[in-house]
């Protein structure tokens, strides 16, 4: 998953924030995951003009492998990570103890969320 933004008026600030280049991309069309199945997400922050981006998962926790270069998680049982520009990592989690339904994920900066960086997993 690519976390990025767009400076649409060339003023040196992002007016749109997104994952995989589309604002609110998975809000109307959630990412479907099977209950109990391991989800492994490769995330990279390629945001320009903002030094830090983040990922926050509602109602769940994940293990995080910073830079994706270790065999053991760098962080265990977290619900939010921060990434600097060009930083990458791997998230692993399941929804085995959750009811089917929708679970939000988004940046943990209010401005980013309001301008497009908010999406949903749909557990089936």
Language-model regions, residue ranges each:
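Copper-binding active sites and cupredoxin-like electron-transfer domains
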Residues: 1-124
């Amino acid at each position: 998953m690519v976390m990025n933004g767009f400076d649409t008026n060339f003023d040196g600030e992002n007016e749109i924030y997104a994952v995989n280049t589309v604002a609110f991309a998975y809000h109307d069309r959630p990412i479907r995951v099977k209950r109990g199945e391991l989800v492994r997400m490769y995330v990279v922050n390629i945001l320009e003009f903002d030094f830090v981006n983040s990922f926050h998962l509602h109602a769940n926790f994940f293990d995080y492998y910073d830079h994706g270069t270790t065999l053991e998680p760098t962080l265990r049982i977290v619900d939010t990570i921060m990434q600097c520009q060009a930083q990458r990592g791997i998230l692993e989690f399941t929804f085995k103890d959750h009811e089917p339904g929708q679970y939000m994920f988004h940046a943990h900066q209010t401005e980013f969320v309001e301008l497009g960086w908010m999406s949903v997993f749909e557990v089936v």
